[in-house]
Amino acid sequence: MSKEPIIKLDNIDVTFHQKKREINAVKDVTIHINQGDIYGIVGYSGAGKSTLVRVINLLQEPSAGKITIDDQVIYDNKVTLTSTQLREQRREIGMIFQHFNLMSQLTAEQNVAFALKHSGLSKEAKAAKVAKLLELVGLSDRAQNYPSQLSGGQKQRVAIARALANDPKILISDESTSALDPKTTKQILALLQDLNKKLGLTIVLITHEMQIVKDIANRVAVMQNGKLIEEGSVLDIFSHPRESLTQDFIKIATGIDEAMLKIEQQEVVKNLPVGSKLVQLKYAGHSTDEPLLNQIYKEFEVTANILYGNIEILDGIPVGEMVVILSGDEEKLRQACQAITDSQVQLTLLKEGGKA
């Protein structure tokens, strides 16, 4: 994957004026997105994420900042392109939305073809391209169907095909799976991941669900109240979230909070004996391959009772989390915990035996 940024947003501000009020929707945000990334931008409603991505193709003009797309500066405290150049630039960027925005009176085939209206292609070339795009999104057999005859997932596939009609280098997905059921969401995410690999497509994914980012993105930015509060690789953010909002998103995505509620109700945890510790272990990469709990038993005679375990694959790297009760001699227990930490496993003490 190339390390060259295809999208550079530098010190972006977006300010709206409403009834003598000034609303700072985006505040001094800098984000660089590399060619071929699937880049997730996460935040709750009102965080500014959708406003931010709309500046990428200048559907929303910033109040200040600099925008560079594929090495071309398109905004530097003012629009630097002519209207013709801007139209050409926008052809490089496709968009899909939560609501599919298909024309109800047109078939799937005609909806995709509509995006080629000003392409300059012959009628035959357009037909061939539309057929290829529908095949790419797995809808060849639905070409003649109208939107009312399609499921939500199929409508989104038509919208994706239409967004790809002008061979964009960038695809912006703004909450594109929010209206879909979980199974269909996974199918659409798998399609986006496939398009990223097949076409080298850079995808900017706007969502309020960290689960979606976890499933397909390789980098993530977290926004709150118009500000960028955390940014990095998905692996780093999931392994070492700094901000409380990010931690909350990750807890929801991994299900650890729900698991902890059940763990805390177990008698063995309620009545944790002296000489035992309830700990949470987080580990990534090579450390998931080490039989660590077996080693600490052999070396320190410390036993481990596993109450919860989960392994995810994030950007191709295994990341795990466990909640265990470690039991043994006090000094041996201290040494075992140190050995775990020395093995690049993050250890958090949740409860100590004999204490409330």
Curated annotation (Swiss-Prot):
Residues 7-250 form the ABC transporter domain. SMART domains: AAA, NIL. It is a peripheral membrane protein. It holds the Pfam family ABC_tran. SUPFAM superfamilies: ACT-like (SSF55021), P-loop containing nucleoside triphosphate hydrolases (SSF52540). Belongs to the ABC transporter superfamily. Methionine importer (TC 3.A.1.24) family. The complex is composed of two ATP-binding proteins (MetN), two transmembrane proteins (MetI) and a solute-binding protein (MetQ). PANTHER family: AMINO ACID IMPORT ATP-BINDING PROTEIN (PTHR43166), METHIONINE IMPORT ATP-BINDING PROTEIN METN (PTHR43166:SF30). Part of the ABC transporter complex MetNIQ involved in methionine import. Responsible for energy coupling to the transport system. This is Methionine import ATP-binding protein MetN. It comes from Streptococcus agalactiae serotype V (strain ATCC BAA-611 / 2603 V/R). The gene is metN.
